[in-house]
Amino acid sequence: MRIYPVNNLRGAINLPGDKSISHRAALLSAMATGETRIENFASSADCASTLRCLQDLGVEIRRENSTVFVKGVGKTGFHKPLQELDCGNSGTTVRLLSGILAGQEFDSVLIGDESLSKRPMRRVIEPLTQMNAEFESAAGNRLPLTIRGVNPLQAISYKLPVASAQVKSCVLLAGLNAKGKSKVQNPKSKVRLPSSRNHTELMLAYLGAEIEENFIESEDGFVQEISIDGNSKLSAKDLQIPSDISSAAFFIVAAACLKNSDIVLREVGLNPTRTAIIEVLKNFGAEIEVLNRKEICNETVGDLRVSGSGNFAPKTNSNIIGGEIIANLIDEIPILAVFGTQIENGLEIRDAAELRVKESDRIAAVVENLRRMNARVEEFPDGLKVYKSNLKGAAIESFGDHRIAMAFSIAALFATGETEVSGADCAAVSFPEFYEVLGEIVS
């Protein structure tokens, strides 16, 4: 994919449905009683993996463009699969589906592509083993993962060692098939807010689950505890998926960095556990306005208007991002690092070691590609520091990672000269229409 610099971006665009919410909509609809209509379902290959696995478990699914119809089978109505369940590149599919399969009375095997097969699954194996499910895995707790389900599972109280929406969701989904109430505690936080994405909790409540959230206060912070009753039943309800803010982040950064840009991103999900990217960009001077804010299916949604200024410096006198906020920024860090090349005195990102075990080693991938584009950058075990730099077009390696491909395609828009991104088609993992949508607003 060859990309050339542009003057600015202009126009209003619709983005695909949120990937995180789409996964959960499909899985919870399958566990519900009745048929669910899901509108604006994500077009990503990852979400297609979730649908395919559910079909292999006997769930009837029909897709009409971006609308998906799911006939729920209830909490224990899944069929023993006739083959291995292929999760493709989707870690979300593996981890959330593990929670459901742990409570079924049959064995199943989860597999994935080469990238996913390198990612450790210990964080879901541990709590599910405590709930009496049994597992066999490849060396290092990797795929293929055999799950020997039990029903009912044993309810547990589980303290997450690190904030993780996927592990939390896995335990909550398993809790639907447990005897009694299962509880999940997030790590202590300085603020009385969820410390990871809460799409699962919001959707469970919307579909009728008996789920409670409490904040346990101590002298030095708050511990969020979520409990779910194994007697809960889910009832089908139509769902509308907001546009994906993680996909929106690429266009927000592009428009902010190109002077005289003016774009509107329609009906973007503005869940407070996902808007850290907007807060960070605004703190550095990006001009972002929220319009038409509303609630849809328990999720906050609004239009985002972004104007290009091209002048960025921190309002808080700190160019360092780290600590608790990282859990709510983890998918946006590659594009945030690109943005750092445009900030006065640059940007330092810490406490992001989790990026080492994503679809690629994202820290190493970002550092290498920034250096190829003439940026000055330092690498740390848990992050990086990028200095304000005049980017130059270069040969970029995507490493088969969709977020790397898209982040450096955006960098190419305000670099000097031609940039070629190898393996750019991997963007389809989360955003198949990325280059098409970008073309709509380039001027």
PLM regions and their residue ranges:
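Structural preference for solvent-exposed beta-strand-turn elements
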Residues: 1-443
